[in-house]
A protein has these predicted regions:
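Flexible, glycine-rich linker and terminal segments associated
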Residues: 2-163, 173-174, 185-221, 230, ...
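Extracytoplasmic assembly/pore-lining segments of large envelope/extracellular complexes
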Residues: 168-174, 179
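Short, solvent-exposed loop/turn segments at conserved positions within beta-propeller repeat blades
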Residues: 224-226
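Feature captures the catalytic cores and cofactor-binding loops of soluble hydro-lyases/lyases
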Residues: 253-257
Length: 668
């Protein structure tokens, strides 16, 4: 039923509640090939003539079709001519929205709540919200630059990082035993290395509390490639408690597990779990885990966890490293971890993570990372402290690292910064100047000195185009020179050609078409700003199952081009390569002037030959038309006589011009 409210210029629609659509319509469809890349090269030329160089490349190849996701990840590294290629993963994935489940086939990592993190070649079915097997690390860095995360001898992923607290996400971890190695390069070319305990990595998706999970296949990193099968399911789910149980069976290995998650008070939750395993039909062992979580609000969260293992307990993949070599350090005795995050306007941003791991062989790893950031007036301060101690065979190896830096804005697009770092007793300090020339280009100049090294002068620049993100730097001192270069981005092959993007392509994305060869149109997407290529296409990575907004920046359009609306919202199905049309139209805006004796009446309506309204004559007797039609136009002269508008100046197309000034007559 429709009710018209004339006085309010409103129509009221009365619709029965049962006629409203309850199910969300997800954007689906599309097929495409994709690729992501991140390339880095570093060169060092010593004063005496010695030359060293290294290169790293991480790449992801894949395809999206009918909501299937196919991905393959690999990394390639060289150091002074010695090369290493590492295969990280290869899998296919499909979500089933009606069942809230996802199927993965190939080289996968189990996402089961009771037996997570097992790398295998096989198949698994698990709840949709637990589909991501990636990890994230929170690190604190003194200067902007690039970072590499390694596990064993394998490069997992590269990042562009800023000074202060950084979250390094999307890590495809290969082992539950190996710690991570973080290698950073600042804009001066300085290389620093830190060891980060594996325990400090956080999963990017929540492990399932309800629903069922199943996995079967063969271990991927052990030499025997032993077969295994595991399953778990939720037994009880209430507002106060969630109970889950499951089991795992492999060649010479059996395990049973349970887990309980309890809501103690408000947002304070606890979890208890136990796994009992039998190895070789004889050895029996158990592990016990307990955790507390208190996410008070978006500004404060507390977490702590602890686990203890009996001497006879083994995981099914114990004893094997990420690079396939046998490890003797897998007999973990206990693991403790704690973290606190605080964000208050008066105190700033504070983060602390700590971990402690002991093995039955007497090995001991202990570490913590503290970071603090606060803005005083216009000055931003960052403080970071990190310490890691490794004890093996009664021999200790300790890494200590601390830094303090500041940043002072000098205007809208420039700032002055300074820093001081101390790494295992070596002190360095320096200052720099940053200038952002445009949203796509920035450069910096810095100087650094230390007691151990000669003063260093460095410069770097970064450029983000519609095709790729490029960066480079050069540094020089009395002892030699350093050079660096980087390129990162993605590409999508679709039915209309190849489209490059400066951002990595996610598992769900949209292929934006402007329906004409209109380059350099700025488009704001959930993953960042992109620009249309010379064919009028761009790629936008999307978040599945959520509403995503894609918006044209109208200021980036030429004056004679418009995109009606200029904004689109869509909720995509995971794995969709959604075609998104935002058609751009070239318009003929014109300002018509008339001689006094042949001028239409001010306020007169201007119509086409079909009688449709086109515009109104202005009070000064001029006529502005947003899109000048090709056919005849008619108006009225003073006195009411109908007249035809005839151009005395021919139309000339001027690309980029907002409008064209024309002379005309209104002829009776």
């Amino acid at each position: 039923r429709i009710v018209e409210q004339v006085e309010r210029s409103t129509l009221l629609l009365h619709i029965p509640a049962d006629a409203l659509r309850q199910e969300t319509l997800y954007a689906t469809g599309g097929s495409a090939l994709m690729a992501n890349y991140d390339f880095r090269r570093y060169d060092v030329q010593a004063q005496g003539g010695k030359y060293r160089h290294s290169q790293t490349l991480t790449a992801e190849l894949g395809a999206n079709f009918h909501q299937w996701i196919v991905r393959s990840g690999q990394s390639y590294t060289t150091f002074d001519g010695e090369a290493r290629f590492s295969h990280l993963y290869r899998y296919a994935q499909r979500s089933f929205s009606g069942r809230d489940a996802v199927l993965q086939v190939g080289e996968i990592v189990t996402g089961d709540a009771l037996f997570p993190g097992i790398t295998l070649t096989g198949v698994q079915m698990l709840p949709e919200h637990a589909a991501s097997d990636r990890l994230s690390l929170t690190v604190s860095l003194p200067r902007a630059g690039s970072a590499e995360v390694w596990q064993g001898k394998i490069l997992l992923k590269s990042y562009q990082v800023s000074a202060g607290i950084n979250r390094l996400g999307g890590l495809p971890a290969l082992s539950q035993q190996d710690d991570f190695t973080l290698v950073t390069f600042d804009e001066s070319g300085n290389r620093q290395q830190q060891n980060i305990p594996r325990l400090q990595a956080q999963p990017e998706s929540a492990l399932p509390e309800s629903g069922s999970a199943f996995a079967a296949g063969r271990l991927r990193l052990s030499r025997e490639r032993a077969p295994l099968m595991l399953a778990s399911t939720g037994l009880l789910q209430t507002q106060r408690i969630a109970l889950r149980a499951g089991g795992l069976a492999g060649e010479g290995y059996l395990a049973a597990a349970w887990q309980a998650r309890l809501r103690l008070a408000g947002k304070l939750t606890a979890s208890l779990s136990q796994i009992v395993a039998q190895t070789g039909g004889k050895k029996l062992g158990a592990t016990h885990q307990a955790a507390l979580s208190y996410p008070l609000d978006q500004q404060l969260s507390l977490t702590t966890s602890a686990s203890w293992r009996s001497r006879g307990y083994r995981t099914i993949d114990s004893g094997w490293r990420a690079d396939g070599e046998e490890s003797g350090d897998a007999q973990i005795r206990s693991q403790l971890a704690a973290g606190v995050s605080l964000n208050r306007a008066a105190l700033g941003l504070f983060s602390l993570t700590a971990s402690d791991t002991q093995s039955w062989r007497g090995n001991h790893t202990r570490g913590y990372t503290l970071a603090w950031s606060r803005t005083f007036a216009r000055v931003n301060l960052n403080l970071g402290v990190q310490k890691n101690r490794l004890t093996v065979a009664r021999q200790q190896h300790e890494d200590r690292y601390a830094y303090l830096n500041f940043s002072l804005p000098l205007g809208r697009d420039s700032n002055l910064r300074g820093w001081m770092t101390r790494n295992n007793g070596a002190m360095r300090m320096g200052a720099g100047y940053d200038q952002t020339v445009s949203p796509a280009f920035a450069w910096s100049l810095s100087s650094e000195q230390s007691a151990q090294q000669a003063p260093l002068l460095a410069s770097s620049a970064s450029w983000s185009s519609k095709y790729s993100q490029l960066s480079g730097g050069v540094a020089r001192s009395a002892t030699g020179s350093r050079f660096s270069f980087g390129a990162r981005g993605g590409a999508v092959v679709h039915s209309e050609g190849v489209t490059f993007t400066p951002h990595s392509v996610g598992d769900t994305f949209s292929i934006i078409s402007l329906h004409r060869a209109q380059p350099d149109v700025e488009i704001r997407t959930p993953a960042g700003t992109v620009w249309s290529d010379r064919h009028g296409y761009a790629i936008a990575s999307l978040t599945p199952w959520r509403k995503n907004s894609v918006q044209i920046n109208p200021h980036s359009l030429p004056g004679n081009v418009q995109i009606p609306g200029g904004i689109a919202e869509l909720t995509p199905f995971r794995g969709a390569a959604v075609p998104l049309d935002l058609p751009a139209w070239r318009v003929r805006r014109a300002l018509l002037t008339f001689p006094p004796e042949e001028r239409p009446e001010p306020g007169s309506a201007v119509e086409n030959s079909r009688g449709a309204l086109v515009a109104y004559v202005s009070e000064d007797g001029t006529l502005f038309i947003d899109d000048l039609p090709a056919g005849p136009l008619y108006a009225h002269r003073p006195g009411g006589a109908r007249c035809a508008i005839a151009l005395t100046t021919p139309w000339v197309d001027r690309p980029g011009s907002l409008y064209t000034l024309l002379s005309a007559r209104c002829v009776i």
